[in-house]
Amino acid sequence: MSNGRRRGFVILIAGVALAFALRALPLYWSSLPSTLDGFDYAWLAKTATETGSLPLTQRADNLVFSTYLSVVSLVTDAVPVRAIQPLATVVGGVICFVGGVVARRVLRDSGSSDGTATAVGAVTATLLAIQGLFLRRTTVPDEEILGILLVITLAFCLHLALRSRLRRWWLVVGLLLVVFPMTHTFSTFIAALVVTALVVRHVSVRLSLRSVLGPGVLAVAFWAYMFSYYRFAESSTTLSVPYVNRVMAYPGLFLAWLILLAIGIVWVQQTGRRVKQISYLAVVGSFFGIVGLNAVSPIFPGTTQTPPLILGLVAILGVFAVTAAFGLELFESYRGGAIPTAMFLAPVTIIGFGLTASLTPEYYDTVMRAQTFLHIPAAMLVGVVLVRLLQAASGSTAGRTLRLGLVALVLVSTVATAPLAYLTMDTATVPSTTYESEFDGVRFASTHTDSPWLSDHSLTRVGANYFKAQVGYSAVANWLSGGPSPDCLVISQRSWTTTGAHLFPNAPETVSATAYAEWTATRNVVYANTGNDPVVVSRPVGNATCAAATNRTV
């Protein structure tokens, strides 16, 4: 093994170790899930381990992740609600490793030397480990974390299957396509777009009846299977289906973007490098523009504005994004470049659809989720640029210093975005997780009373997802805005007087410490605890009837 290749493997191991460490950091604050959806999967896994069967009363795309969590809980003898965050840590670290391995293969197939390919793979894994937005999405314990891993694997295996026509690769592709709809709906849409892009690119290179019928039928069959599964799940069972209704609301628009994807995958790999760079910067610049404008006024009515701290960290990410523009030659090779090209254009298609469909919180969520998948090919492009700078001919001392300075700038600025993974996006506070004190308060209200209770968005989601409590937060939001005190059991927190109560998708609302103390003094406090964010459970004095009993808006 050459010295360069050995150094590359050392960097890869160090980068993956860093990925695991950063994704384990939420466990420092709490062993509970760092995302509210995680409590729903924990409930599903808990029910499955206790009864021996998975409840078919939730979403149609959480079957694989919930089953996986159930198995891990049984094997480790851990309660699912405590096992889910460590599981996410492991899967998130594996994603970075797989991303690095795929990047190495892409460079090798594009004609780079073994040492260069290994170096790019190592840098890619390290960038994925530390880049703030990607770190955030590969730290939270939900089914998308499996979806991201499967999308990378599918793109790699399908491209090899199309190139080699070997049966073993087609078997792996077939297995992946079967499990996608049951794993994560949004990732399934990304996967379908990746399949479409790779098939179109393959046909454009090897135009023949065989190339059109074989891979073309596969792409059409997967789209048909995906929609058929979700239609069956929605109409024939008690399972719910997210995201699909957003596409079906504008089918013509989605088809138009699908056609643009098919044209784009061929155009990108045949057009000039300067045109590609301008087009890339326009696409990426639109994302930064949206975040910036949202800091002034919500782009999507009814959603919260971007906090200044979040805006600053995202702006720093611009160094990473601009650097990627100088590695776009990676898109030019069919043998290797088709993989990152398809993985880039697939989420761009979803982002374009979301921005042109409707200015609503649902489509805002669609755009934000799609950008996660952009970071994988972008990290490969940045890896190419950094390795090129490091391997450039020595030249003058000033030239070497400049190149090392540019590499340091990219790495330091990327590390500086890491806090994005741990911040609560609407309040820009750390950590973005559920404290033990919060969970204890929710457990008390949910298990010691049969009556409905109220709180902010975060705590009501925990109650509804894990304890299946009857909850709501509209009356609390009304009180925080100057309305009457809620006539129900309320879980309140000290943070309501500082960072505010979470009322997603609306902006947080605060109450003064004095007003909060006076309010709790006028109610019967039935539970209180201490901790990082003390919780108080109180009910109104007298025999007030909870008017919000039917309010289940969570």
Residue map of PLM features:
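Membrane-embedded transmembrane-helix bundle of lipid-linked glycan/lipid transferases
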Residues: 1-426
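Extracytoplasmic
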Residues: 97, 132, 392-399, 408-554
